[in-house]
UniProtKB/Swiss-Prot annotation:
Residues 1-29 form the signal peptide. A lipid is attached at residue 30 (N-palmitoyl cysteine). Transmembrane segments: none annotated. This is Variant surface antigen C. PROSITE patterns: PROKAR_LIPOPROTEIN. A lipid is attached at residue 30 (S-diacylglycerol cysteine). The keyword Zinc-finger does not apply. Residues 32-160 are annotated as: Disordered. It comes from Mesomycoplasma hyorhinis. One of its GO terms (cellular component) is plasma membrane. It is found in: Cell membrane. The gene is vlpC.
Length: 160
């Protein structure tokens, strides 16, 4: 009797450990895991702080939405473990803030290299067409302000 109870507890513990260990792998491989609130595409949510596995932009849904064939590992509001933030690349369309590489079209703030088209602020090198502010070298055509050397045609201010 005692052995049976111990075996069940061990099985439950092992199952939980496997489920928790597989979540970061799915986040890395699939790029979308376990949203913990309803998100509409382009609504401008962020993935910083203590939010658990939220995805930004381009993904709408609510509750526990899992991807990559994994199901039944989350319950309740969809939070799995504390302070587990997503670090997988994705391609949202607009209004996101994150710390992972992506190729957005507009209105993003991040700290990794990318090739956006408009309206971005970042601290890494990029090749941009318009309206950017950054602190690293780039080749830009118009309307930029930065604090590093660059080759620009018009409307730039620099301090080096």
């Amino acid at each position: 009797m005692k052995k049976s109870i111990f075996s069940k507890k061990l099985l439950v513990s092992f199952g939980s450990l496997v489920a928790l260990a597989s979540i970061p792998l799915i986040a890395i491989s699939c790029g979308q895991t376990n949203t913990d609130k309803s998100q509409q595409p382009g609504s401008g949510s962020s993935t910083s702080g203590d939010q658990s596995g939220t995805t930004t932009g381009g993904h709408s849904g609510s509750g526990t939405s899992t991807s990559g064939g994994q199901s039944g590992t989350t319950s309740g509001s969809g939070t799995t473990t504390g302070e587990q933030t997503e670090t997988a690349p994705k391609s949202p369309e607009s209004g996101s803030q994150e710390a992972t590489p992506k190729s957005p079209e507009s209105g993003s703030q991040e700290a990794t290299p990318k090739s956006p088209e408009s309206g971005s602020q970042e601290a890494a090198p990029k090749s941009s067409e318009s309206g950017s502010q950054e602190a690293a070298p780039k080749s830009s055509e118009s309307g930029s302000q930065e604090a590093a050397p660059k080759s620009s045609e018009s409307g730039s201010q620099k301090t080096t």
